Amino acid sequence: NFIHGLPHYCISIALMERGVITQALIFDPNRNELFTATRGRGAFLNDRRIRASKRFRLEDSLLGTGFPFRRHQDEDAYLTVLRPLVDKGAIMRRSGSAALDLAYVATGRFDAFFELGLKPWDVAAGSLLVTEAGGLVGDFDGEANYLDGGQMLAGNPKLFSILVPLLQPVLGSGVQPAAPAATDAAPAPRRQLRARSRAAAPERGAAEDDRH
């Protein structure tokens, strides 16, 4: 986006202490919007408290996502999972910035977000923003392995529980991208909610400009 002059990019910084993300900052210089979060103290946009949306039906929701930008990169799996979402009436947008998409989930502009092939610096700050805004984050299996696994699903609790069973059989960690989906149904919602709400991660920091 930045290279092509499209005004949708950001600076995304997260602080990780002892494997836990404790501080997050995402700055959009084009709109002068500063998203911040401190673990246990809420999420804010330009010092105003923000919350995830409360929409609970896919047909009323706006979802952010990211399509493969390299040829043949999981394209069959993406196309397979898009059909049930479209059939259920979900409206989707691809903005090109995973970090801003997560900030938009935190502020309720997007109701949910999902994408494959992400790096820790794409999602570290945004994951804390979402959880501090009352949302949930995880991988497509409903687990907390989103930093190392490259999968990110974020949204309000209701939509999260709806999207996991749709994404997991096609894009879950146990599915090989080039093979037919073969995993079982998603885990029980109770176990998902416990795992997703943690901002756990490996023992390393994450601070990078968002170039996704």
Question: What does each model-identified segment do?
Answer:
Residues 1-10:
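Glycine/serine-rich anion-binding loops at beta->alpha junctions
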Residues 120-121:
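Acidic donor-binding loop at a coil-to-helix junction in glycosyltransferase catalytic cores
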Residues 115:
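Short beta-strand and adjacent tight-turn residues that come in two discontinuous sequence segments
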Residues 134-151:
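Acidic, metal-binding active-site segment of PIN/NYN-like and related structure-specific nucleases
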Residues 103-106, 124-132:
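Hydrophobic residues within well-ordered alpha-helices
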Residues 24, 43, 126, 133-135:
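Small-residue (primarily alanine) positions within well-ordered alpha-helices
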Residues 12-102, 149-212:
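Acidic beta-strand-loop-alpha-helix segment within the catalytic core
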Residues 107-112, 135-136:
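Alpha-to-beta junction loops
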